[in-house]
Structure formats: structure tokens, C-alpha cells
């Protein structure tokens, strides 16, 4: 009697670890499509928010790979791939710290808690805008877009921490916003 052929034993996981690329892409798209954020990133002038809205193509360029690095302002990593010499604003993303939630409880083997990071950096020579500080307004819009969102993980995203951030010998300043997400292991 011939042996019975077994099915493929591999079952793809459906966990937050498997969703990192998709989450980052969705976060970058949400950020780029926001009218205020896109204007604050695209226009380096004090009147950025009163300028005309960007076209959809211009918004897409803010989050798309650009070998020259001239148009991209939203990155799936904390750092930009090139040294920045121009006056610009950036938003970088990070995902980290996924650990079993409340390891002392019985249900912890099914859930993990981790953090989504938003790194907001603005050249210190273009921080001042007509409505206040560019980095503060970027922070407010990102917080508003993602706080209590149900688009990532199994629950809603909550603020976890906010830290001031300075890079490149204080040429760029801004914030590191950490938001907590809970998902299946």
C-alpha cells in the first residue's frame, strides 16, 4: 500500500512580526496623504501651511524610494540613507520591543506588546513657521492620525512615550514619539 501524501506542514504565522513591512508601508502612506503633514515636509518656508496642497503624485514622492534623495521625506527607518546638507524635515519609522504581554498572566502566550516609533526631525533653520514650531505641528498631526487607531494590531494604538530628539550636532531637532500596540503572537 503506498504511503499517503501528507499536506504541507508549514502554516504561515499571522503575527505582528509578519506584518512589519505592511504596517510601515501603511503608516508611510497615511503620513504622506495628510495635507498638513505633506505641506510641512515639502515646503521649507514659514508659510508652509498656507501654501497650496500637494498633488497626489507629490505626496507619493514624499514616501517613495528616491535614489537621489531629493524628494523623499518619509523613511521606513530611523535614519536617512544619505548625509543631509539641505534644510529639510523628515519623519522616520521604527518598530521595536515586541515581547509577551504581561508574562505573569496565563493569556500572555497568545499576545505580544510592542512599539511603533515616529522620529520627527526638522532642520533648526526652518523650525519657525507662521503657526508656531514645525516639529510641534508635525507631532500633533502624527499623534492625531495614529492615537486610538485600530488599523494596526488587534487593539487600538496608544501613546507610550514622547522624547525630544536632536541629531547631527544639533542641526536637526524634533521628537521621538513611541506608540504602544498589542497583537497576536
PLM regions: where:
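Acidic-leaning, charged glycine-interspersed low-complexity segments
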Residues: 89, 133-185
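"Short basic amphipathic alpha-helical interaction patches in structured regions
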Residues: 106-113, 130-139
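Hydrophobic residues positioned within well-ordered beta-strands of beta-sheet architectures
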Residues: 91, 114-118, 175-177
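Small/polar-rich, solvent-exposed N-terminal microdomains that initiate assembly or binding
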Residues: 1-104
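Short, charged/polar micro-motifs that form catalytic or ligand-binding hotspots
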Residues: 13, 17, 128-133
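Short acidic, glycine/tyrosine-flanked loop/strand segments centered on an H-E-D-like triad
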Residues: 111-128
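Short, cysteine-centered beta-strand-loop-beta hairpins and adjacent loop/turn segments enriched
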Residues: 100-106, 123-128, 184-185
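Short, solvent-exposed beta-strand/turn "edge" segments of beta-rich domains on protein surfaces
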Residues: 84, 103-111, 168-172
Amino acid at each position: 500500500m503506498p504511503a499517503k501524501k501528507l499536506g504541507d506542514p508549514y502554516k504561515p504565522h499571522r503575527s505582528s512580526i509578519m506584518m512589519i513591512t505592511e504596517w510601515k508601508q501603511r503608516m508611510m502612506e497615511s503620513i504622506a496623504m495628510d495635507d498638513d503633514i505633506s505641506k510641512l515636509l515639502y515646503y521649507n518656508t514659514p508659510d508652509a501651511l498656507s501654501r497650496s496642497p500637494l498633488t497626489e503624485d507629490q505626496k507619493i514622492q514624499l514616501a517613495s524610494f528616491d535614489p537621489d534623495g531629493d524628494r523623499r521625506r518619509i523613511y521606513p527607518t530611523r535614519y536617512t540613507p544619505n548625509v543631509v546638507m539641505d534644510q529639510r524635515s523628515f519623519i522616520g519609522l521604527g518598530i521595536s520591543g515586541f515581547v509577551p504581554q504581561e508574562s505573569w498572566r496565563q493569556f500572555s502566550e497568545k499576545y505580544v506588546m510592542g512599539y511603533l516609533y515616529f522620529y520627527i526631525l526638522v532642520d533648526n533653520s526652518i523650525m519657525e513657521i507662521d503657526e508656531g514650531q514645525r516639529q510641534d505641528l508635525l507631532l500633533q498631526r502624527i499623534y492625531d492620525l495614529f492615537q486610538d487607531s485600530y488599523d494596526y494590531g488587534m487593539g487600538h494604538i496608544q501613546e507610550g512615550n514622547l522624547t525630544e530628539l536632536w541629531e547631527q550636532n544639533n542641526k536637526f531637532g524634533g521628537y521621538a514619539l513611541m506608540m504602544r500596540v498589542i497583537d497576536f503572537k
